[in-house]
Amino acid sequence: MRYKITIEYNGSNFIGWQKQKHSSNSIQEILENAILKFSQQHTTVYVAGRTDAGVHALGQVAHFDLTTNLDTYVVRNAINYHLIPHAIAILSVEKTDDKFHARFSAKKRHYLYKIINRYSPLTIDYNRAWLIHNPLNIENMIQAIEYIKGNHDFSSFRARHCQSKNPIKTIDDLKIIHNNQSINIHISAISFLHHQVRIIVGTLVECGKNNFSPEHIKNILKAKNRSYAGMTAPPYGLYFVKVDY
């Protein structure tokens, strides 16, 4: 039986989603151990988006297989019990057919990046948003996103060690919602290059600091060189929001 799960987690204290040889503090390994404890079955959990260390999730989706057919609420409650005290929660469980794959069946992935633009330090949002002290030019940032949306070669917007063979991606939606000190950047695509969202955010912030003009985004894309874009924004402001199937 295949189970589809929706997961929420605070990524602050984890090394990221993916299991690592020399650490037991990945979200994947902790989740697989929780499933083992209640089901007595070893299983692999496949995820829609492998988040990096420090990145959070509001609606991450994954799947795993068990030989037993259990009520979904039993699976949810049992996993959550064995996840204590980790900052990981199973929000929902669905039964699905074997054709469903959390990663390969995904049609669109949605991310949110949170910025707090103020001089005072963060308390409630500490490790959950990027604090930028100097006032940002929001209008410049909004103008810049128009050059990022759509289908482009995003070689300038990916990590130097990115293993993807094809740097061409389509950004379906990119918008900024600004409310007083809060700047929320929403971005959606079928898939992303490694660090692509965080580099886009870092580049938009350079526009907000008036270091880049909005039109300079065209030069960055044309260069196809990571050094032309802005910094990689910190992981703790990034949230995996949801997946469309």
Swiss-Prot record:
Reaction(s) catalysed (UniProt annotation): uridine(38/39/40) in tRNA = pseudouridine(38/39/40) in tRNA
Write out the residues that bind substrate: 111
Q: Which Pfam families match?
A: PseudoU_synth_1
Active site (record annotation): 52
GO biological processes: tRNA pseudouridine synthesis
| Recorded GO MF terms | RNA binding; tRNA pseudouridine(38-40) synthase activity
- Annotated keywords: Isomerase, tRNA processing
Q: Does the keyword tRNA processing apply?
A: yes
Q: What is its EC number?
A: 5.4.99.12
PANTHER family linked: PSEUDOURIDYLATE SYNTHASE, TRNA PSEUDOURIDINE SYNTHASE-LIKE 1
Q: How does it assemble?
A: Homodimer.
Similarity section: Belongs to the tRNA pseudouridine synthase TruA family.
- Write out the function statement from the record: Formation of pseudouridine at positions 38, 39 and 40 in the anticodon stem and loop of transfer RNAs.
| Name under which the protein is recorded | tRNA pseudouridine synthase A
What high-level taxonomic lineage is stated for the organism? Bacteria, Pseudomonadati, Pseudomonadota, Alphaproteobacteria, Rickettsiales
UniProt lists the gene as truA
